[in-house]
Amino acid sequence: DQRTQDWTSLKSSRSPSFDIYDPASNAVIQQIRSGSSDFRALGGLASVNYKFLDRYIGSFNLRADGSSKFGANRRWGIFPSVSVGWRFSEEAMFKALKYLSDGKLRISYGQTGREPGNPYDRHAIYNTSNPSQYIDNPVIIPRQVQLDNLQWQTLSSWNLGMDIAFFNNNLSITAEVYRKLTQDLLWDRYRIPKSSGFTTLKWFNGGELENKGWELFVRANPIKKNNLSVNLSFNISQNI
């Protein structure tokens, strides 16, 4: 993925007529600006899926993402994911249970990444000043610190769950527990000591955030006739 943008703007005043829409024809040209931006991203995905006798199910994915929003030191992020499932209702010992319609245990783990929004946030930026700043001469002032080691924010997710259904799928239960861990958090405008010559870093990696909990969902169809159907559902969860 590659995106390039070029732009030009002109600000003027004292137009000779409201019927003239070209700002360059105005009496006073106040400001002329131009610029360009360039962003590149490259990604790849490898995936392997396995299924045996409709009982044992597995999936493995590996994703690699590279972005020009990061410095050359930390440009690439590697994000794996794996999931395994066992449909125990297909086993001979459970097939004898006539009231059991379906049953599955599953476990999964995966990672995803987050990047900054602006492709130039990692670059050093300099401003030019008015001539009165230093002995009536213009000067160049550093405005933003270059971030060579800025890296991907990573979210790791674990999930363990069970799906089970009874009585021709008229009663189904889904239960799961999960844990999410966000590492190398991306902090926007992170404050730093003024003795550094700056007040903030545009982005800073630091810290982690953990989120875990459980959820239970129950659905029932106690009445299912030609002209009447009753659906009941119940959900409870806790997040820490």
Task: Report each predicted region and the residues it spans.
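Extracellular/periplasmic, surface-exposed regions of secreted and cell-surface proteins
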Residues: 1-240
